[in-house]
Amino acid sequence: GMKPHFINGTKGKAFYADINFDLLGEIAKKIVQKELEDIYNQFIIKPLELEHTFLCKKTSSFAPIYLNATPLYRPLIVSSAGASGGIVSTAQDTMKFLKSFYSGKLFKETYLPMLYRWNRIRWYPMEYGIGIMRCKMSRLMSPFFPAPEIIGHSGSFGTFAFYCPSKNLFITGTINQ
């Protein structure tokens, strides 16, 4: 059998795995008694008026990524990701989501500190809280000026969404190569 990376609940330990999001998606489906697409539409996409955001299906069409000059079409892999990466969006819609996430439009802002239990993960200098990442550079990595911390998430397929609390700055983007 497989051995765990550490005993569950060990202070300061975290291991990033997309399966955590998939499990959360399954729990949401059981509680709400709806499909994931309907849950996203009801609680996130429609309330935030995200016009270019959807849960990918096998028949979905969107821009390919490129490997050198070769386009790679990936709706099958993205549609199979579900809660762990099956959302397709634009940088603009991702910005709306990010600002809403940190301003209390999705849930009370008082819940945010509960997500900030930072643990080191394998991708230094990234740390992981509950569902979100933090990047906090050491002075060794940023010797000329202190780099402010950013919190948010990087996506599996070339997207990122981060918030810099000390500057009240929101950063989103997408890449396809």
Give the location of each predicted region:
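Short, well-ordered beta-strand elements
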Residues: 167-177
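Short, surface-exposed loop or secondary-structure junction motifs
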Residues: 1-151
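Short, small/polar residue-rich loop motifs at catalytic or cofactor-binding pockets
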Residues: 155-157
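Short acidic-glycine loop/turn motifs at beta-strand connectors
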Residues: 136, 164-167
